[in-house]
């Protein structure tokens, strides 16, 4: 039997067939529940479950390191990390739910449009950690309490400092169209990576699809995940990256690798990465506990320390050496618009790059 293909359009069509008539922007399911503290009762209930299934697009080493901090904080609860590109995570959850397999407890995705789909389907469990209620700005949390931005990253450029002089490095996306970069560029794919899907939408909106059409003529090395281009550049397999996760480039530089991050002159595409709980979670209390700790000042501070990423928690400062978010020229995201465009973006991108 051929494997069923799941797209955002097909998943939302299922929701409409089940009686979902309102557009996403108009749908208010309920008032957000009050903020909840981590209590001894929650910890005990989580320990009885013993584990949490965490689906994420975080770089695997980061996800595992962060999860181990939680496990050390709450002994007896294991985090089972299921890491893949956000678009693959999205497809996997759809496939599992279509087969009535409810394995995912808790998710963090780099494609914020995903949570709108899951919310529309009625798959998400409203839950607001106390710190989210008190310290997360309204722009970073769902009004119904079903998801919130737990980490913020940027899709940026980078170059290998052994292969490219600082004065010759690209300053922005348009510079990559210079013939001197022919065969020297690596980039990730929006059909795999949520961060790259988000940035592809933003770049196509602001620069036009003609940018990608011209970039495709540069004999670009195509990889899957948004965490891969910085690694390829650091290894010297390509001189520059056309897109990739900023935090991975910074981590590699901190380890002494020959890589330098560039925030594009046109604006760096921002990627809001939300957390969400699933109603059908097999380990609901462990999921609540992990999600709650993730959003505490402690959890958010640890994430900044490990990754150098930004967080939504108002009490947590950026990592040393990183400017305030307000000082960064941002290419804005738009998850609700992306929700309508994602399938078209995948098709058009594949046609342009032939991959």
Model region roles, listed by residue range:
Residues 113-117, 239-258:
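A ligand-binding cleft/hinge motif common to bilobed small-molecule-binding domains
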Residues 4-30:
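N-terminal export signals
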